[in-house]
Design a protein with these regions (language model features):
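N-terminal short beta-loop-beta anion/metal-coordinating cradle
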Residues: 1-62, 68
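Regulatory input/activation interfaces that engage signals or partners
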Residues: 187, 193-205
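Active-site-proximal beta-strand elements of phosphoester/diester hydrolases
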Residues: 45-51, 142-146, 190
């Protein structure tokens, strides 16, 4: 049997497009989460939405690993563009992910004792995503993502752009990557841009 894939979204609207793809779907509840399990083509999968923010995403990721026995997690949803070259409706796929609101030594001097603040995307999942992006004909970018507990705007956006040079920002990806790293589980985040740095700048002008 092929490895079981976990699909984790922040909101029910982000999860909704995946549910019709699940054949022989079953539904159960755990930790106040609704878990959908079935098969996408011949691949076993479990899908859920966590609710917004880092802790909710981390809880959901651990449930997927412990209860659903997934062997990889894909975090899917929306994000805000940070790099000025990013446009609304572009898709961004994470090559690496970090928190923009956590002190660096929290991750390097304490558990999980990382070499840097960046959680890398899984190479095999990235190779599959690269091929899918080429086949899609849609605007897809690969690069850094950052995660924090609040929406960014104005000076906050500029500070994050200068410090981390990400393509986009969200409120869950790094937390899911963190849990996957601690459990030795492959991870990838795929985000569609719903707001861009250029649009935010225009609104402030």
């Amino acid at each position: 049997m092929l490895p079981k894939i976990g699909i984790l979204c922040a909101g029910d609207d982000e999860l909704a497009p995946f549910l019709p793809l699940l054949d022989r779907r079953s539904v159960r509840r755990q930790a106040m989460l609704t878990i959908h399990e079935g098969w996408i083509s011949s691949v076993p999968a479990a899908a859920l939405y966590s609710g917004v923010c880092k802790v909710n995403a981390a809880i959901a990721a651990q449930v997927l690993i412990d209860s659903c026995r997934v062997e990889a997690i894909i975090n899917a949803g929306t994000a805000g563009g940070i790099d000025p070259s990013i446009s609304i409706f572009d898709t961004v796929i994470s090559t690496e992910t970090a928190y923009h609101d956590v002190a660096e030594d929290i991750l390097t001097e304490f558990h999980p004792w990382m070499d840097s603040i960046w959680f890398p995307g899984d190479p095999f999942l990235l190779s599959l995503a690269t091929q899918a992006a080429q086949d899609s004909g849609r605007p897809v970018r690969f690069g850094r993502m950052v995660t924090g507990e609040a929406f960014l705007s104005g000076p906050g956006t500029e500070a994050v752009r200068s410090a981390f040079h990400p393509l986009c920002a969200d409120m869950e990806s790094a937390a899911v990557a963190h849990v996957c790293h601690a459990n030795g589980i492959p991870f990838l985040s795929i985000r569609t841009i719903t707001d861009s740095a250029d649009r935010s700048a225009a609104a402030r002008a």
